[in-house]
Design a protein with these regions (language model features):
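Basic nucleic-acid-binding alpha-helical/helix-turn surface characteristic of O6-alkylguanine DNA
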Residues: 1-204, 251-258
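Short glycine/serine-rich loop segments
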Residues: 204-246
Length: 258
């Protein structure tokens, strides 16, 4: 099975997950829903995650996810530059497209750091249009960047070894505070929205924090995929719960709790 068709089958399977269900479906249930054999599905999951379907999806059960909730103590060692959104007009954005285990990403950076990461879903013109509409940069220049290379190395290491490049954040002070707070979540571990709210000094502001999490411009490098609802289920994700699972699972599997 080609890497593209393998990813397609895995994404279709992950798309069958209900974001707020405590127990994931079984391999048999998924193969029946997808019209494939359990063997085909297991082979796709082993190629993607190194484990067969049922063992992989156990990591997304609420029983397991509850154990991953981690105190927000140390933060990743990364340089952060905070700017208001309207200041993006003062910068040229250098962008390019990169194939990753999570699909094609469009990365963009200013002269100061990585500023945008978008899942293109193979719609490059749509990704460019979104950057134009949201940031109105002074210029968009297709080019590689050392910031992009550092970010991709970090992603390949599942956030464990390679450091992040400087991150140039365009947002309100509150948004930037929430985005910075997510850098306290270790790879292979998760937190609740309420935990982030407490960390940024807004213990009753979980809903506002959730909105800021959803506006994260640098997923998966700022790891909003590690934030869960109080029910300890997968929860929602701007790019869809299937992609959240695709990004989160390799981290959970590489840092097992048993």
């Amino acid at each position: 099975m080609s890497s593209v068709s393998t990813r397609t089958l895995v994404l279709r399977a992950l798309g069958e997950l209900l974001p707020h269900k405590a127990i994931p479906p079984t391999s048999l249930e998924l193969s029946l829903a997808l019209g494939c054999t359990s063997e085909e599905l297991n082979n796709a999951f082993i190629e993607t995650f190194t484990l067969p379907t049922d063992e992989t999806l156990h990591y997304l059960s609420s029983e397991y996810l509850a154990k991953t909730i981690s105190p927000l103590t140390g933060r990743q060692d990364v340089t952060l530059i905070h700017s208001r959104r309207q200041e993006a007009r003062e910068y040229a954005f250098r962008y390019n497209f990169y194939e990753t285990y999570a699909g094609e990403l469009m990365l963009a950076s200013t002269e100061r750091g990585l500023c945008v990461s978008l899942c293109t879903f193979m719609d490059r013109s749509g990704a460019l249009e979104r950057i134009e509409q949201e940031f109105h940069p002074k210029a968009l220049i297709q080019s590689t960047s050392a910031f992009h290379d550092e970010a991709l190395c970090h992603l390949t290491s599942l956030g464990k070894r390679a450091s992040l490049p400087p991150l140039h954040l365009f947002g309100t002070p509150f948004q930037c505070g929430v985005w910075e707070a997510m850098l306290h979540i270790p790879s292979g571990r998760c937190c609740h929205y309420q935990d982030l709210a407490t960390l940024v000094g807004k213990p009753r502001g979980a809903q506002a924090v959730g909105t800021a999490v959803g506006a994260n411009p640098l997923a998966p490098f700022i790891p909003c995929h590690r934030v869960l609802p109080r029910t300890d289920t997968l929860g929602d994700y701007y790019w869809g719960s299937a992609l959240k699972a695709l990004v989160l699972l390799p981290e959970l599997i590489s840092s097992p709790l048993y």
